[in-house]
């Protein structure tokens, strides 16, 4: 908030910020490995200043807030409302996974093995993933909240909708209405707060049909309903598409594919 005047003086009219939903810890500081879509990560707020204050301060200066959101995947520590595997200890060192992420083990009514913390890192990862992707041959993800395909996919065909792009990005089954409705509910809260647009991460890894049916209409309806929170302004959405074919972006016209519009 203190830097908004400086940013505006540079000529910028909007601030695009990385995802703010709660992540795990350690390397998951950047926002792209959600642990709880329904909460703002405490590391971005203080007791006196909340995300709403940033939105209001930007609007007061006639600036916009573009929020980066992730619909395609979670992190690999489960998700608090889809597959709860850990409790979060905010009083511990947030750079230490073992200290701040408290496993909910079987003896405590959870899903992780009782010896979880003594397992090597790779086995810990497998113990988490089996409850999200059924990687050990058991049907643990009975609600089908995640795609169960591993890493066999191609950048430029439909397989990227179902494959997992990395070990720390567990692919959500966005075709499942329970998943898409949950994501719309969570991110819809930010529309209600007055954010001016969404930059949608890994958009190319979700089918266009799912976007057109499960996400875009619901976001647009909320944006229209809460238009006054943006001082009557439009709501802008754009998505990341990472591919090897330039025509994925704009009909094979290379000069239209970069996103540094004002530099051309």
Predicted feature locations:
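Active-site-proximal helices and loops of the catalytic beta/alpha 8
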Residues: 55, 59-62, 73, 84-86, ...
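Aromatic- and acidic-residue-enriched segments that line the glycan-binding/catalytic groove
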Residues: 26-38, 72-156, 217, 252-262
């Amino acid at each position: 908030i203190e830097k908004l005047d400086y940013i505006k003086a540079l000529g910028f009219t909007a601030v695009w910020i990385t995802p703010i939903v709660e992540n795990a810890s350690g390397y998951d500081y950047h926002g792209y490995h959600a642990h709880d879509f329904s909460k703002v990560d405490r590391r971005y707020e203080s007791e006196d200043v909340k995300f709403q204050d940033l939105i209001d301060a930007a609007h007061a200066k006639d600036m916009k807030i573009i929020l980066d959101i992730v619909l395609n995947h979670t992190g690999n520590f489960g998700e608090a409302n889809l597959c709860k595997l850990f409790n979060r200890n905010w009083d511990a060192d947030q750079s230490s996974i073992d200290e701040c992420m408290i496993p909910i083990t079987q003896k405590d009514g959870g899903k992780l093995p009782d010896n979880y913390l003594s397992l090597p890192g790779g086995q810990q990862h497998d113990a988490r993933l089996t409850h999200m992707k059924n990687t050990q041959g058991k049907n643990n993800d009975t609600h089908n909240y995640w795609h169960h395909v591993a890493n066999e996919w191609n950048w430029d065909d439909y397989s990227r909708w179902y494959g997992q792009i990395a070990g720390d990005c567990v692919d959500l089954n966005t075709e499942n209405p329970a998943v898409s409705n949950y994501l719309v509910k969570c991110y819809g809260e930010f529309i209600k707060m007055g954010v001016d647009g969404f930059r949608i991460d890994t958009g190319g890894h979700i089918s266009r049909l799912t976007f057109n049916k499960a996400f875009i209409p619901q976001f647009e309806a909320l944006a229209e309903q809460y238009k006054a929170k943006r001082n009557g302004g439009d709501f802008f959405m754009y998505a990341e598409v990472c591919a090897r074919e330039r025509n994925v972006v704009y009909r094979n016209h290379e000069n239209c594919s970069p996103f540094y519009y004002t530099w051309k």
